[in-house]
């Protein structure tokens, strides 16, 4: 996810994206512990996306 995509989103869209990414991270961690996850780099990529979304949310709110 690029920062330019997030810049154009509203607070509601960013909040929804944050929830979506958090659920995806939960599923990836579950797959990791059950041995089904092949691409472990996906976890860190999703965590970075969550951080980007949270950064834009704090900019908008505050």
UniProtKB/Swiss-Prot annotation:
Q: Which family does it belong to?
A: Belongs to the universal ribosomal protein uL29 family.
GO terms (molecular function) for this protein are:
structural constituent of ribosome
Swiss-Prot/TrEMBL keywords: Ribonucleoprotein, Ribosomal protein
Q: What Gene3D superfamilies does the entry give?
A: 1.10.287.310
* Name used for this protein in its record: Large ribosomal subunit protein uL29
Q: Name one GO cellular component term.
A: cytosolic large ribosomal subunit
Give GO BP annotations, semicolon-separated. translation
């Amino acid at each position: 996810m690029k920062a330019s995509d997030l810049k154009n989103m509203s607070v509601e869209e960013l909040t929804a994206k944050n929830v979506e990414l958090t659920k995806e991270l939960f599923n990836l961690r579950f797959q990791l512990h059950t041995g089904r996850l092949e691409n472990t780099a996906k976890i860190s990529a999703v965590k970075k996306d969550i951080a980007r979304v949270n950064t834009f949310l704090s900019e908008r709110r505050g």
